[in-house]
Amino acid sequence: MSHHYSGPEWGFPLGDARLDLTDLYAFPKPGDTGKSILVMNVHPSASENPPGPTITEPFSPIALYELKVDTGGDAVADIAYRVYFSSSEGGAQRATLRRVEGPQAAGTGDGGQIIVEGALVSTGDRKSVV
């Protein structure tokens, strides 16, 4: 996880740390170079080793977290991965990931194939993988 603040005057987008895209990584999948792994870091921590989540709702439930991929070399997205997070319920958030292909990938919206639905978001020192 990144431990830095970005943007003008070290501020966050709209004053909300949950909207701060801190890093983006893309690399080939080990053992299958025909596939890629994409990682997006958001919401920087305030210290090198925070004892837990820095706030009770680490992802904004009104934001769209999105990665767009251009596979045609024309600077227009051909694939989009869109992640929405629920409001915190009982101290936990859930995530839904959609994959959008074709012309709709260049825009925004709720369409696309659901890849992961309602997955529990892991925070703190206990991680879970879907």
Where are these regions (language model features)?
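Surface-exposed extracytoplasmic segments
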Residues: 1-130
